[in-house]
Amino acid sequence: MKKQTVRAALLGVLACCAVLGAAYLWSVHDYQRTVAAMTFQEPELAAIPDGTYTGTCDVRFIRAGVAVTVRSGRIERIDLLEHKNSRGQPAEAVLDEIIGEQRVDVDAVTGATNSSSVLKKAVENALESTVPQ
């Protein structure tokens, strides 16, 4: 009887682990699909009034928040308010590229492609928040 109880408990633990593992794998798959599907729209900088605008992007495993300062139709500054990532800190260099090229869809940082995309989308969302709906 004791062996059956131990066996049943082990099977229960294994079943729970299998369910949790499957849920985690589904989350990872969903995250990867979301990032891969990201597209970028270039906002018309000349139409954006001077000011500082905030934007965020959250794709579960990576989250970013930025404050974008626009002056005279140019991106003058991007402040990183938040960047939750696992190994994507090098992607933060993409913010300087956006300022230098004055466009959102710059090349991603090698080895930090997903974080680069999330940061670019946060900047785009900040700039789009200025457009009347």
Protein language model features and the residues they cover:
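Intrinsically disordered terminal and processing segments
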Residues: 1-65, 69-133
